Amino acid sequence: MALAGSALAAKAYRNFSAAIYVPVGAVMALKDPKVRDAQYQRITSQLKFDKVYLEVYRSGQFADAATLEAVKKFFIAKGIGVAGGIAYSAAETGGQFNTLDYEDTRDRQMCRRASELAAAHFDEVILDDFFFYSTKSEADIAAKGTRSWTQYRLERMRQVSDELVLKPARAVNPHVKVTIKYPNWYEHFQALGYDLDQEAKQFDAIYTGTETRDPEITDQLLQQYESYLAFRFFSNVRPNGANRGGWVDTYATRYVDRYAEQLWDTLFAKAPEITLFNWADLASPAPVAPGDRQAWSGMSTSFNWDDMARSSPTNTGEAPGWARVAGYSLEQVDKFLGQLGHPVGVASYKPYQSSGEDFLHNYLGNLGVPVELTPDFPSNAPLVLLTEAARQDPAIVTRIKQHLAGGKSVVITSGLLRALQGKGIEDVAELEATDRRIAVHDYIGAYGAGRGTSLNEAGRTARDVLFPEIRFYTNDSWPLIRGVAEARGVPILVMNRYARGALYVLNIPDNPGDLYELPQPVASAIRTYLQGELPVRIDAPARVSLFEFDNSTFIVESFRSEPASVGIAVTGNHKLLRDLVSGEELPSVPPPQQQDSRRRSGPPEQGTHTEFRADVPPHSFRVFTVR
């Protein structure tokens, strides 16, 4: 079975563990002692790690027992922990991922066999994120009957988890712990049988796919912030340490910094373990290429290519590979992670088996709004953010009313407003998301009666952004931020008071990526309202994120390709911000003049804020604590 803890080598990092996933093809290659020694030397000369996951099955290929034992014995002798892995995939066709057909007798037998094989050799087993259900064979169609594909697949995969994975594994090895890794496409899980509600609790633990890759050239177009948000969300699905770690691969990036960012953001979310996929890439003798990073190559960025290239644990002089990029990036954040508290953010509710305004939270995260996503309604939060996904909760209007009656705030998006029209939201506010669209490039901020003040950026003509028109009644609802086009206005943020609370509607562009096109004063005004009682806010261009913690520490990270000047407002009276990486201390600066959007477009600030300003290099982070 797995290696006893007492035989492990010293922990590679202080604040997390590092693991490498070894796919079955790489496991079989390690059967050769020469290959094994060479690849191990290549990786360990550039990267420290604590554990390997040795895969027993993928795409029709099984590892044999003798090879598994030989490879396991090799790593144990090196003081490396061992665990098993399974990828329940079928052979790929046409570049598409194919799953097993769980109505097919042969595929069901393969599923059971893989589980039994893994449990026979390991006390810990992880399922790679192919444990979903995409086939539509004649048998599947017949078994589905009158159910939707979503309902059929959810029910079938709960059965498969129990009957073909967990029970067979535990019958072979009563001590085995089985972890299911969930991928990065959480908005669409239920349609393919992934179930964060019931299935996630069937397994001993879960794991988070935090690979976001490139946000513009990949088919998924996942935004960078998701590497953080997904781990936080899944940690609220399975709290108390049952979300065991985050998982990042080396694929689909245009510049090497993007790989480092995924690792950093996973660990900023307080993942206890980071898994690197995969062994073959990390062991490759080919040198890693810097990629398209010429625009910032001469700047003092968080990922310093020259520093990385010069550094290695053993100084072998070999050209650095992906392993060194990973090692360098992990070593950087390990220096300060222990000084950070528990992550905090704007509480946002996404019910189980829900979708709507898909992945919107990550665009908001890239706009500088820290988000804490949860599958349970956060009734104790002073402000709750609800996107269209909340429509899946049949009691959502009642929850909104109760939250407002308790003197708290609720922010709903235009997508949720539309979804709830005719379903009771009119009892709170008579607002209507119409079918009309208005292309906006001028913006006004105003709180209360009056003409308001321009929120446009001086010297910059904003691009047209297409917003849904929200109809409201004058003096019943108040637009706090409005867009204007040819003497016609559309609310960008509108407020309606109800009982002791306040309902806000945030208008989302037809293309959520157009949030990045909003003038900086508009984005800063939105942050003021959304972040409520959170102690830190930033005034920054798009693609600059804020990560807040509950002990007066925070991180500002820029995903931009040029330097960013960032205003920072911290609740209370403070003299200095101290950079926990460089040791630099930043003095407070005078508060912005009255024309600053954050002051003029919202209600009077509650309490005292101290203002600071920091420069953040491209694709870099800065870590601060207040003094």
Question: What residue ranges belong to the model's regions?
Answer:
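A conserved amphipathic helix/loop scaffold
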Residues: E388-R627
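Glycan-processing catalytic domains of CAZymes
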Residues: L8-A381, L385, D393-I396, L404-A405, ...
